[in-house]
């Protein structure tokens, strides 16, 4: 069963601003996520520690001399939502993950709030 993988609305313009090599590599691991869903593991995906969402994970890939991470989570519809990406090479890993997780948490919380609001409208 193929899994649905979506870009968060705020992530889409950020994705389009990335170098084409990074876009291609990200789409390749997103395809793996669509094929394997939550079963996708290392070296392509791993759990993010420190998130307020227990199901927050990261896609992992290398492109353009960088070590890229994309925070994502599966929502209640069982769809993977790609939230934010960043190159973790050349800097404080702790600071990188703190910033990545903060942005991912904010975006995923907003996504969940929108889903709840839509459900109430029905």
For each predicted feature, which ranges?
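Basic, Lys/Arg-enriched alpha-helical interface segments
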Residues: 1-67, 76-80, 87-122
């Amino acid at each position: 069963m193929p899994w649905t993988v979506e870009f968060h609305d705020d992530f889409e313009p950020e994705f389009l601003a990335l170098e084409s090599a990074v876009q291609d590599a990200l789409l390749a691991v997103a395809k793996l996520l669509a094929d394997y869903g939550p079963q996708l593991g290392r070296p392509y995906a791993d759990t993010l520690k420190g998130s307020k969402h227990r199901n927050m994970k990261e896609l992992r890939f290398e492109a353009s001399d960088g070590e890229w991470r994309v925070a994502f989570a599966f929502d209640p519809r069982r769809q993977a939502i790609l939230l934010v990406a960043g190159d973790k090479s050349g800097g404080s890993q702790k600071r990188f993950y703190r910033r990545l997780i903060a942005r991912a948490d904010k975006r995923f919380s907003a996504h969940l709030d929108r889903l709840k609001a839509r459900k109430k409208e029905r």
